[in-house]
Design a protein with these regions (language model features):
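NTP-binding/hydrolysis catalytic cores, primarily Walker-type P-loop NTPases
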Residues: 227-271
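Conserved C-terminal guanine-recognition region of P-loop GTPase G domains, centered on the G4
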Residues: 154-169
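Inter-motif core of Ras-like GTPase G domains
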Residues: 113-116, 130-152
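Conserved nucleotide-binding/hydrolysis micro-motifs of P-loop NTPases
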Residues: 46-48, 91-94, 128, 150-152, ...
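Beta-strand-loop-alpha "switch" segments that mediate conformational coupling across diverse proteins
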Residues: 201-228, 239-242
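G-domain G4 guanine-recognition motif of GTPases
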Residues: 15, 148, 173-187, 210-217, ...
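Walker A/P-loop NTP-binding active-site region of P-loop NTPases
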Residues: 9-73, 120-123
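P-loop/Walker-type NTP enzyme "switch/lid" segment
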Residues: 42-116, 221-226
Length: 271
């Protein structure tokens, strides 16, 4: 097997629904692609259910078709922009931990085959702390935890970080505050989370910024597009471009953790 081109693998997650995680995944992916990065967004939530609403796309095939040998991973990719594609993972993710050795090998080959066509893999996980979420997050190189200004958001984010740290030794997390009314509000949310993690866990948290509450985001969703395209000069669009700039500066780790082949191996391993 050829050595895989190093790919930055980022899992976007949050301890609960309603934090705008899918919107973050999609807009971050679009912003990175606008910078010239080749991005694959893996929808690991409910197939294209959420991403479909945001991008107006329809998937003919899913990862399950690749596992059954009906098509290649490249044939499953749905192009969303010039340098952005989506992997509709829908039904395939349900059986990720029950793959045969042959399917396991096929999946690694499949991702290895498309490694050369991408620089970044963004994984939009489901809400909560299900086995599927844990699998995707612990396999990724970077974990971006999205929080918003609701009391349960911080509590649920802490529960997710605690589980990943205690059971899977994930010890480094990036935190993004979404739908904030000021950057200070975002920093305050991060401080609350940092206070409890510093007290009870051995983890490193890094604040990566905030996305402002912006009516343009809701209007873009109604138009089945992203705020970066519908309202490119909006406050939210500007914030997403700043976030993409920061993410682009994150190093691709030299260790195998986060490389595609390793990502898939971790994904299909029984915990």
């Amino acid at each position: 097997m050829k050595e895989a081109h190093p790919v930055k693998v980022i899992a976007v997650t949050g301890g609960k629904g309603g934090v705008g995680k899918t919107n973050v995944s999609v807009n971050l992916s679009v912003a990175l692609s606008e910078m010239g990065r080749r991005v694959v967004l893996m929808d690991a939530d409910l197939g294209l259910a959420n991403v479909d609403v945001l991008l107006g796309l329809r998937a003919k095939r899913t990862l399950a078709d690749v596992l059954e040998g009906r098509c290649s991973l490249q044939e499953v990719l749905v192009q969303a922009a010039e340098k952005m594609w989506i992997v509709p993972a829908s039904s395939g993710t349900q059986e990720m931990t029950a793959l045969s050795e042959h399917q396991h090998a096929e999946l690694i080959h499949a991702f290895n085959d498309i490694a050369d066509m991408m620089d970044v893999l963004v994984v939009d996980t489901a809400a909560g702390i299900s086995n599927s979420v844990v699998s995707f997050v612990r396999a990724a190189q970077e974990v971006l935890v999205v929080v918003c200004d609701e009391p349960t958001s911080i509590t649920d984010a802490y529960a997710l970080i605690k589980l990943l740290n205690r059971d899977y030794r994930v010890n480094r997390f990036r935190v993004l505050a979404n739908m904030v009314h000021s950057d200070q509000e975002g920093r305050n949310m991060f401080s609350k989370l940092l206070t409890v993690t510093d007290r009870f866990l051995d983890v490193t948290l890094q604040y990566v910024g905030s996305i402002p509450y912006d009516e343009s985001v809701r209007k873009a969703v109604q138009k089945q597009t992203v705020v970066l395209k519908a309202f490119p000069k909006s406050r939210a669009a500007l914030a997403y471009r700043q976030l993409a700039n920061r993410v682009d500066g994150w190093p691709v780790l030299k260790s195998p953790r986060g490389h595609l082949e390793f990502f898939v191996e971790r994904l299909v391993q029984q915990s």
